[in-house]
Design a protein with these regions (language model features):
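Sec/SRP-type N-terminal targeting helices
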Residues: 65-69, 82-83, 129-157, 169-193, ...
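Periplasmic alpha-helical coiled-coil/stalk elements that build and connect Gram-negative outer-membrane
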Residues: 81, 193-313, 455, 459, ...
């Protein structure tokens, strides 16, 4: 490696400096080289453009994957709320047998009376989307008995019962089910807003992580160039000591400068690994086999192209498209729904009710009991007068041969204050509070956009200043090296110029990287709050909604 080569070169050249100082410096370089050599090399290097990084994040980022499930959860919530409108089918079958002990001569049996009854029922009931409720029930029965005085045995009965109830005031425009359905739809819209916000925030983080990695790599190159300059100065000074134009003590300063630059290289290499991990976590699937072994080589270099910034247009765009503002407006819409519901609940409970019942009976009709014959002690002898089967009975029910109907209105009104009035007062105050919070959030958004625009403009100026500083430092170092070569300079000033140039190069690289990141932030701040924050908007009647995040109650 490069460090090992430096150690070997220094060993071959040798110097006339003290054995103690030379051996200490060489040992430190060897230790640093050994540490670098022992680090595991990356198994694979992947060339990556910034657009490819964005596409990978859209496919594999865990945060986006998590948020993509939320709209599906909200779809289930809408279906759950709508399920209260689903019809409910009910069936029933029962059989009853009863044996009675006769307690009088007119009980209808000598020793006991056996009654047997079979009942079946089929019904459907439903709450309708406009607040009404209906129920339809069909019943049938078959009754047999040993009672001698019973007119029918067996007796068949059937009836159809229809009921309908329609709210006229309370629960007419909106009821609890319609409130839940409407709020569930708004929650579904909110999940889409939050998903788009998470995607935008993640892509912003990916782009910034990409530029951070690019900066770390360029910074390492700058530190390596500084190290190479200091090593060249060390070699030049060693030659001057050999020919007697420089004191041996000046070698120590050169060695110290090399060691200091070596430390900066080590730190720069560690920063690259940290930047690699940060980008890796944003764009790769942790379940992939090469998650930790692959490293990235950015193919897009951070460029500096001055761009005009229209702050007013950006503020207008943010006020129209910011996810936290959209979430806040969504919460106000939910508050409107809740206010409408509670305003309706303070109205009188007036319902129109209609009931329609049609019945029919049949079976085997027996002749009347001859009580005169019974008085003489003759046995009871009854004959079949007529028979009507189940089909005839069902026909009577369908044709409404024996109808029974009822139409009525029920009115209910609580005396004194009630819970609905308190709820309405509460949600109105919360709605007013939420409107003020929205105005405050709009002010925060405008401030954030202006700050982001100011950062872009500041970084533009930083790049120009840092570039000019780097060019001047290059000229300064060149002048000091010429003076040193002519025997008119000092080692201290050469090393100072090298350090200044290194700092200037790092500052220029940092300024260009910060400029590109500020452009990313300026675009993102018009869509999402930077840092995933945001305000809190109170949703009247349903708790608190975090704006700009993904927390709801």
């Amino acid at each position: 490696m490069f460090l090992r080569t430096c150690v070997l070169a220094l060993t071959v050249l040798g110097t006339t400096v003290s054995a103690f100082g030379q051996s200490t410096f060489t040992a430190s370089l060897q230790a640093a080289a050994a540490q670098t050599a022992n680090q595991p090399a990356a198994e694979s290097v992947r060339r990556l453009s910034i657009d490819e990084a964005v596409n990978l994040a859209l496919e594999q980022n865990l945060g986006i994957r998590i948020q993509r499930i939320d709209p599906q959860i909200q779809d289930v919530g809408i279906a759950q709320a709508r399920s209260f409108w689903a019809p409910n089918l009910q069936t029933n079958f029962s059989k009853n047998s009863q044996t009675q002990q006769p307690t009088s001569s007119l009980a209808g049996g000598a020793t006991n009376i056996l009654n047997s009854n079979i009942n079946t029922a089929l019904g459907v009931n439903q709450t309708l989307p406009w607040g009404a409720q209906y129920a339809a029930t069909w019943n049938s029965s078959r009754f047999t008995t040993t009672n001698q005085f019973q007119s029918f045995s067996p007796q068949i009965g059937s009836n159809l019962n229809l009921q309908y109830s329609q709210p006229l005031l309370r629960n007419f425009e909106i009821d609890q089910i319609r409130q839940q359905v409407a709020n569930s739809k708004k929650s579904r819209e909110l999940s889409d807003i939050q998903l788009q916000g998470v995607i935008t925030q993640t892509l912003r983080n990916v782009r910034n992580a990409y530029w951070d990695l690019s900066y770390s790599i360029n910074n390492l190159k700058a530190q390596q160039e500084s190290l190479a300059l200091s090593q060249q100065s060390l070699r030049d000074n060693q030659k001057r000591v050999e020919i007697g134009t420089m004191a041996p003590i000046d070698i120590v300063q050169a060695q110290a400068e090399v060691a200091s630059n070596e430390e900066r290289v080590i730190v720069a290499e560690a920063n690259i690994k940290a930047a690699q991990d940060n980008l890796r976590a944003l764009i790769l699937d942790p379940g992939s086999a090469d998650f930790w072994s692959v490293s990235f080589e950015p193919t897009d270099a951070p460029a500096f192209t001055a761009q005009a910034i229209d702050v007013d247009a950006a503020v207008r765009n943010a006020l129209d498209k910011r996810s936290d503002l959209a979430s806040a407006k969504n919460s106000l819409e939910q508050s409107d729904i809740n206010i409408k519901y509670y305003r309706n609940q303070i109205k009188p409970d007036v319902n129109a009710n209609v009931t329609y019942i049609t019945t029919a009976a049949g079976g085997t009709l027996l002749s009347p009991v001859d009580f005169a014959a019974i008085a003489t002690g003759a046995p009871i002898n009854r004959t079949i007068v007529s028979q009507r089967g189940f089909g005839s009975v069902l026909g009577d029910v369908v044709q409404s041969q024996y109808p029974n109907w009822t139409v009525g209105i029920t009115v209910g009104y609580p005396l004194g204050s009630n819970v609905s009035q308190a709820n309405l007062a509460r949600v109105r105050l919360q709605y007013e509070q939420a409107q003020t919070q929205l105005k405050n959030l709009q002010l925060q958004v405008a401030t954030q956009v202006r700050n982001a625009a100011r950062n872009v403009q500041t970084n533009q100026q930083r790049v120009a200043s840092a570039r000019a500083s780097r060019e001047l430092q290059e000229r300064k170092l060149e002048a000091e090296e010429k003076k040193m070569a002519a025997g008119m300079g000092q080692t201290f000033f050469v090393f100072q110029a090298q350090r200044d140039l290194s700092l200037a190069r790092t500052a220029e690289i940092q300024a260009i990287s910060d400029y590109n990141k500020s452009l990313v932030d300026f675009e993102a701040v018009q869509l999402v709050p930077l840092g995933g924050g945001g305000g809190f908007i109170t949703t009247a009647g349903s708790g608190t909604l975090q704006v700009g995040g993904i927390t709801r109650q």
